[in-house]
């Protein structure tokens, strides 16, 4: 998979931010992990969820990945404009993660699996890289 099905328009970026903002209390009221955690955000897109979850965990480190460099650039800009400094954005494919097994304390993904050709395989690949548990919202 190498393209986001809804495209990369400004309209879509605004829709994603509106969606994240309107559901943040419902989805992320408990998205708080232990200080010092290393968290993988798989399929971060434009950073719509990142801007909500990373500030709640300012003493943890996020590695937020996506396959789209354009989306990652937007995510970096959103993080910078919100003074979010605990996130490293990286181009990576969920099916070919460049990290050691059990590297992450937690993994979270939101609105990602429905875009995968094989979501079970995606979860299996992610499972190799986690020590604790992961959260996903689809």
Walk through the language-model features, giving the residues of each.
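Conserved alpha-helix/loop element of class I SAM-dependent methyltransferases that forms part
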Residues: 18-37, 52
């Amino acid at each position: 998979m190498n393209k986001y099905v809804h495209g990369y328009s400004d309209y879509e970026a605004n829709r994603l931010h509106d969606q994240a903002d309107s559901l943040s209390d419902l989805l992320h009221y408990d998205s708080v992990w232990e200080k010092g955690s290393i968290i993988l955000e798989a399929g971060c897109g434009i950073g719509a969820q990142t801007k909500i979850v990373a500030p709640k965990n300012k003493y943890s480190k996020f590695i937020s990945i996506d396959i789209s460099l354009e989306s990652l650039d937007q995510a970096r800009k959103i993080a910078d404009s919100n003074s979010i400094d605990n996130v490293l954005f990286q181009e990576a494919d969920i099916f070919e993660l460049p990290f050691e097994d059990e590297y992450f304390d937690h993994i979270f993904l939101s609105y990602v699996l429905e875009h995968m050709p094989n979501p079970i395989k995606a979860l299996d690949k992610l499972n190799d890289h986690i020590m604790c548990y992961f959260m996903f919202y689809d």
